Each structure stands twice: as C-alpha cells, then as structure tokens.
From Swiss-Prot:
Biological classification of the source: Eukaryota, Viridiplantae, Streptophyta, Embryophyta, Tracheophyta
PANTHER family to which the protein is assigned, alphabetical: HOMEOBOX PROTEIN TRANSCRIPTION FACTORS
Regions of compositional bias (Acidic residues) in chain numbering: 188-203
DNA-binding region extent: 229-293
PROSITE patterns: ELK (PS51213), HOMEOBOX_1 (PS00027), HOMEOBOX_2 (PS50071)
Major location category of this protein: nucleus
Residue spans of biased composition, Pro residues class: 22-36
One Pfam family per UniProt: Homeobox_KN
Record carries keyword Amino-acid biosynthesis: no
Keywords: DNA-binding, Homeobox, Nucleus
Residue span of region Disordered: 1-36, 122-145, 179-206
InterPro entries (alphabetical): ELK_dom, HD, Homeobox_CS, Homeodomain-like_sf, KN_HD, KNOX1, TALE_homeobox
Protein name (record): Homeobox protein knotted-1-like 9
Length: 347
C-alpha cells in the first residue's frame, strides 16, 4: 500500500522519515475501507503538494509532521466500519432480521427488550442529530461500496427472518425434496432437460397453497410418520402378548390347551389382540408343540390288522396295541379325540 509520502509527491530530498501506512482491515474481502479515510488521505496529499510548490521542500516536511499522528489504529478502523454499516440503506432490514431470529423461543422479559431495540435506536439517532443515509438517496459524489452492498444483501437480510419461522423451514425442506426428486438421472442433456419440466416455472399460488397445507396438516403428517416407524412387522405379535398367551398355554397344557370363546374374549382384553389373532396363535402352537399324554389305567381301542375290527387291550397289552394307540389316540367321555388329523369332541 502506498504511503503518505509517495502520494504527496515525495517531499524534500532532505526528508528521510517515511510517513506511516494505513493499517488494512482484518477482513478486506467483506468490507472495504470507509470513504472517510480516503477523504482524509486525499486532503493530506493535496496540502502536501501545495506546500511543496510554494516552499520547495520546506512545506513537505511540515505536511509530514502534520499528518504524523493520523495513523489509523485497529479500534478506529473497526469503529469506522461499524459507522459505515449503520449508515447503509439496508441496515434497518438487517437489524429487523437479526431481532426476529433472537425473538424465537425467547423468554418474555428478553422478548420485551428485543422489541424495544428499534425504538431506542431511533431515539439515539434523533439525539445525535445525524439521520441515517437509508432515508436519503445516494449522492453522485458518494463512492459506491459494492462489497458492503453485497454483505448487506446476504443471507442475514434475505433469509434471516424466514429461517426463524418453523413453517418457512418446512417449506424450504419440501422445496429441497422436490428439487432432488426432479434431478435428471439420464446421461444425455435432453433426458435431464425433460426429466422435470414443471420445475422450471412454479406458480406463486402453488407455493402459497403448499405453505397453507403444511401449516394445517403438518402435525398430522408428523403423527403418521411416527406411527409408521412404530408399526410392527406383519404376522409377528408383540412380545408381551405372546408371553401372556404362552403362560395360558402352559397352565392348560395337560388338559386341553385351546381357549373357549369366553376365554378368547378374556385373553383379547388382557393382550390387546383380537380373537382371530388369538385363534391363529393357539392353532399354530398346538400343531407344533402339543403332544397329548395318555392317562394311566385307561384302555385304548386298537385296530386288528386282519379283520379291521376293534379290540380293547389293557395297560399291559402288546407292542402292536401300543403302536396303534399312539397312532390313533381316543379319549372317551368328554375328552377330545383325533380322527384323520382333525380334533373332535367326545359326547
């Protein structure tokens, strides 16, 4: 960066002291130096050139001594940057967006303080007697600061207030999902261009309708999503219900492990299942795990191999009678018996 001496024309040859250079800001890519510093620099340079033309060297040293104390400190540069930002036409929008974000979820006392900030700022400006330039059009002699304009029009101004609204966040999320679904998967440019033609132009009324539907049915959609995530697999009963059915099965295993209609209703109330689910569970359980045990001292009918008639044998019968009894169990009285693989109730 050029020094004051070089801008003043070099001064006298006898002047060996170099004037201090301006300290650049910490982030020059975001905010440019304030125009006030350029005005001071231009005034110092013109006075130095005027002194050099009249005094032939003596004025140069006087100008150097006059601007010796004009070195800009970091604190002064920061204050000048703040003043430039506060005087920008978009400063009110930036302040409103920032306060809108802070108000989301704030306690009542903090919300009251945040609401009073704009009014207090206006009173402070009126007391200082320096109205902001946002109320005045830019003059022709003002140096345009494009970097500051870009900073003021960044996401802090345009998206700050919208990010604080939960409904706006939902709309932005839906927009991103729609954009991702409309991305073309083809390899050629024609396929990508024709993959989602309706995404090129979106009617503003559609956006408004989508926003209204989201605000109205957003809670119901969240409940449905939660219900689908907790949905059990098809054909598999809950663990607690299965434990209760298994407990009933073990208690009635020796007699007849199949509930009646009244018992099904009781089990349905305790397990939260319907009677059809209970019936299917007991049918599968009985087919897979139930093996009826004969009662001691009971006689079983056996089938004679030759004549096909029935013959009663005692408990100490032969092996053929025992095999026939195991293949065709029959319980007399009110006990059930098996015929052709089907369970029947005795009379």
């Amino acid at each position: 960066m050029e020094s004051f001496a070089s801008l003043a024309g070099g001064g006298s040859s006898s002047t060996t002291a170099r004037l201090p250079e301006l300290i650049p800001p910490e982030n020059p890519d975001r905010i440019s130096p304030p125009p006030l510093l350029y005005q001071l620099l231009a005034g110092s340079a013109s006075s130095a050139r005027h002194g050099h033309g009249h005094h032939h060297g003596g004025g140069g040293g006087a100008a150097a001594a006059a601007v010796q104390g004009l070195q800009v400190s970091p604190a002064g540069a920061e204050a000048a940057m703040k003043a430039e930002i506060m005087s920008h036409p978009q400063y009110s929008a930036l302040l409103a967006a920032y306060l809108g974000c802070k108000k989301v979820g704030a306690p009542p006392d903090v919300l009251t303080k945040l609401t009073a900030v704009p009014a207090a700022q206006q009173q402070l400006d009126a007391a200082d007697g320096h109205p902001r330039r946002r109320h005045e059009p830019r003059r022709d002699d003002d140096v345009p600061d494009h970097q500051l304009d870009q900073f003021m029009h960044a996401d802090e101004v345009q998206g700050g207030a919208g990010a604080a609204d939960p409904g706006s966040r939902g709309v932005l999320q839906l927009d991103s999902i729609a954009d991702s679904n409309c991305e073309g998967t083809g390899s050629s440019e024609e396929e990508q261009d024709t993959s989602c033609p309706e995404a090129e132009e979106i009617d503003p009324s559609d956006k408004q309708l989508k926003h209204q539907l989201l605000m109205k049915y957003g809670g119901s959609l969240g409940d449905l999503r939660q219900a689908f995530s907790k949905r059990t697999k098809k054909g598999k009963l809950p663990k607690e219900a299965r434990l209760k059915l298994l407990h009933w099965w073990e208690l009635h295993y020796d007699k007849w492990p199949y509930p009646s209609e009244v018992e099904k209703m009781t089990l349905a109330q305790t397990t939260g299942l319907d009677q059809k689910q209970i019936s299917n569970w007991f049918i599968n359980q009985r087919k897979r795990h139930w093996k009826p045990t004969p009662v001691a001292g009971m006689t079983f009918p056996t089938v004679e191999a030759a004549g096909g008639g029935f013959r009663h044998s005692g408990h100490d019968g032969g092996l053929a009678a025992a095999a026939a009894a195991a293949a065709l169990p029959l319980y007399m009285g009110s006990w059930p018996f098996v015929v052709d693989g089907m369970y029947r109730l005795g009379s």
